[in-house]
Amino acid sequence: MSRFFANGSDSESESSEEEVPTQFNNKAQNFQFSDDEEEVKRVVRSTKEKRYENLTSIIKTIRNHKKIKDIPNTLSSFEDLTRAYTKALPVISKEENGITPRFYIRCLAELEDFINEVWEDREGRKNLSKNNSKSLGTLRQKVRKYIKDFEDDLARFREAPDQESDVDEGEGDVHDSDADRAGDDSDTGFGVGAKMAELPKAAKSSVQPTKIIADDDDSEDSIDWDPDTESETESSEDENMYQNMRERFLKRTTEKEDKDDDKRKDKRKEQKHKVRKRADDDEDGEGWETVVKGNVVEKPKMFEKDAEIDVPLVLAKLIEIMSARGKKRTDRRLQIDLLFELRDISEQHSLGTAVAIKIHFSIISAIFDYNLKISEPMKLEHWALLLEVMQSMMKLLLANPDINMNESIAEEHEEYATAPFYVRGCPLAAVERLDDEFTKLLKECDPHSNDYVSRLKDEVNVVKTIELVVQYFELSGSNNERCRIYLRKIEHLYYKFDPEVLKRKRGEQQPATGAAGATPAAPVQSSVEVMDKLCKFIYAKDDTDRIRTRAILAHIYHHAMHDNWFQARDLVLMSHLQDNIDAADPSTRILYNRMMANLGLCAFRQENIKDAHHCLVDLMVTGKPKELLAQGLLPQRQHERSAEQEKIEKQRQMPFHMHINLELLECVYLVSAMLLEIPYIAAHEFDARRRMISKTFYQQLRSSERQSLVGPPESMREHVVAAAKAMRCGNWQACANFIVNKKMNTKVWDLFYESERVREMLVKFIKEESLRTYLFTYSNVYTSISIPSLSQMYELPLPKVHSIISKMIINEELMASLDDPSETVVMHRSEPSRLQALAMQFVDKVTNLVDVNEKVFDMKQGNFFQRGNMGNRDRGYNRNQNNQGGNWGGQRRDNRSQRNRNQRGHHKQNQQQNQQQQQQQVHTIDEE
C-alpha cells in the first residue's frame, strides 16, 4: 500500500469503500451498454448521396477560397471538383436522366463571374503575387474550356438565377439526408450531440440542477458523475422513446431542423416584403440610391445659389478645377465629373461655342491625366468617353469656322465674347495621344480573344476622328501640322489591302460614277490614290526628315501590297533609304524592315525571284525576323537584356492585326533560294571556290544530307528541302508535289491574294529551273539532246525550251550549239569529265600543300640575313661595345669585314638547301 493511502483519514476510507461498488456498477453498465449490438444504428448510404456529398463539400471549399481570393487553392479545388463530377456522371445519367444538378451549374456560374471580376480589375490584378497571377491565368483558361460543355445549362441558369434564399434552401435539401445520418451515426463524433438535441427539455433540466447543487469541495466528483448520469438518462430515454422497433428507423426532425425551417420561411417572407415595397416605391416615382460604405463626401458646389452665371464666372471655375491637375491629393474622377457638370451648365445658359470647346478640351486633358503611368492603357469607360468628347469637339470646330484653336495662342489673348474667337489648345496633340492610347489598348488585349476584336472595331471611330482633324487643318493649319496629321492618317491606311485596286488595274471593274441621266458624281478614290495625294504633299512640304522617311516607307509598302512592283522599286532606289536607315530611330527602322519584307513578297508574286531573294535575305540571315519586324521577343535572348530594355522593346511591338506571317516570309525566302541555288550548285559542282547564294538554305540542305534516315516531310522547311533534292535530280513533278500540296496550301499559299495564280507561277518556275539543273548535271553524258523530248519531259512549250537553252549558251553556262533543222542541242564536250575535274582538284590541293610546306620550312630555318636591313641590330650593339675601347675606328672596320664574310657564307648555304628541297619535291610529285 502506498504512502498516500496509508496517511489517509477514516472518513476518506469510508467514502472510498462506499464509492467502490458504485464505480464497479457504472463500469458494468457502461460495458453492457456499449457492447449491446441492438443499440448500434447502422446507416446505408446510396451512391448518389455519397457523390453529391463529395460535390457539395468541394463547392463549399471553393466558395471559402473565393471569399479570401485564394486563387491557387481555388484552382486545385476546381480540379478536384471536375474529377468528382466525372466520378458522379454514371449516377447522374442513371438517377437524373443526364440532367446536370442545379447546384453544380450554380457553382460554375459563380466561379465564372468571380474570374471575370478579378480579371477585369486591372489595378487589383497588378497587385497580385506572382503565384496568384499565374494561377489566375491557368484557372481562367481551364474554366473557359470546361464550361463549353455546359453552355446551354448556364444560359438557362442565367436567365433565371437563384436568389440567396433559394441557394440556402437548395443546399439544405442536398444535405437533408446527411443531417439525418449525422444524428443517427454513432461511429462518428457527432452521435452524442445529435442525441442531446433529440432529448426533451425535461431531461436537460434534470441534469442541470445536479451541477448547481454540487459543492465546491466535491467539484471533481460532480464532474466525474455528470457524464454517467447523462448516459443513463439517454439510455432510459431511448428505451422509452423507441418502444416500437419500426419507430427507431423512421426519419425524424430535430428541434434544430425545425428552427432552420422557420428561419427559411422568415427569410422568404422578408424577401417578398422587400420586393413588394420596392414595387410600391417604383410606382410612387421614388428611385433607389446606393449607400456607399464610409463617410459620405458631398460633391462641392459649382456656384452660389443666387450667382449669375456668365462667361468670366465659368472660365474662373474652369481655371480653378484645372489648377488641381497633377497635384498629389487630387481626385481625378471627381475632376472629370465636375468638368462635365460645368459643360452642362454652360450649355444651359448658352455661353457660346468657344466656351464649350474650351471645356471639351479640358475634359480631354483630364481623361488623359487620369492614368498616371503612361505605359499602361486607360480604362475602357474612359476610352469610350474620350472618343465621344473628341468627336464632339471637332464637330463644333468644323461647324464654327470663326473659332481659332491653336497652341500658340497665349491665355491672356484668348477671346470668348466676340468673333473671331481665339481658344488656346492643340487638337493635333490630342488626336496623336488618342491614337497612341488606341495602340496601347490593342497591345494589352489577347490577340486571339473577342476583346481584341471589340477593341479593333473602335478603329473606325479613331479614323473618323483623325479625318475630322484633317478637315480642320486643311481649312486652317500650317504645313507642319498638316504633315503630322497626314502621317497619322497614312499609318492607319498603308497596311490595308484594297482588292478594288487590282480589279481596276486588270479592267475587271470601272471606277464608280453617277447614275445614267444624272449629274456625274465624282469617282470614288482608291486607297492608292489617297496615299499618293497624302505622301506627295509630305514630300513637298515637310521640313523634318523623319516624317518624310516614314511617308516614303509607308508609300512603298502600300504599292507593294497592291502589286505595283516597279513603282515601289523605283521609290526605294531614288530615295536611297538603304544608305541612311541606320541613323533613323527604332520605330522607323522597324517600318523599313516591314517594307522590305512586303516588297520581297510583291517581287515573288510578280515572278521576280532574284529580287525577292535580295529583299528577304537581310531579314532571314540573322535568324530573328520576329524581333526585326517587332512581332515579339525571342525567349532565349531575354537574359541578354535588362528589364528596362525589355519594357521599351515591348512598347515598340506592332499590334497583332498588322503582323506579317513569318512562316509565309520564310517559305518565300527558302523557295526563292532553292530556285536560285540548285541550278547554281549543278553548274559549279566541281568548283572548289564556289560561293553560296543563300547561307540559310545551304545550311538546311547540308543538315538534311547529314541525316542517315530521312522520313517524309512534315514541316514547311522539310518540304522545301525535299523539293530541292528532287530538283537536283531534275525530277520536277516530285519537286512540285512537295511545294504545292494540301498541307503547304493551308499553311502558306492560301494566304496570298489570288493564290491559284501564285501556285501556277510556282509550278512554271519549278519546271524551268529543273530543266536547267538537268542540263547542267547530265551534259557530259549526252552527245546531243532532242529539244522536243525535253519539251515533252518537262511539259513546257517548245519555244520556251528553245529560249532557255539559248540563254544558257549565250551566257556561256552550257557549252553547246543548237541545230535548228534537227531541233537538237549538240554538246561540245569542252567541259572536263568527272575524272578530269577530280584530277584538277587534286592538283590544286597538292599545290596548296607545297606552298604550306615551304612556309613552314622557312620559319624553322630562318631567313634573317636575307632581309634588307642586313643585320642593323648587331651594328648598334657593336658600337656600344667599341665606345668603351680606344681604337674605335679600327675595330669598326675589322668587325665590318668579318660580318661581310659571314653573310656571304650563310647566303651560299641557303641557296644550296633551297635547290635540294626543290629537287626532292619534284621527285615526290613524279612518283605520285
Curated annotation (Swiss-Prot):
A GO cellular component annotation in the UniProt record: eukaryotic 48S preinitiation complex
Keyword Transmembrane applies: no
Subcellular locations according to the entry: Cytoplasm
Major location category of this protein: cytoplasm
Skewed-composition ranges (Basic and acidic residues): 172-184, 245-264
Acidic residues biased stretches: 11-20, 162-171, 215-240
Name of the molecule in the record: Eukaryotic translation initiation factor 3 subunit C
Natural source organism: Drosophila grimshawi
Gene of this entry: eIF3c
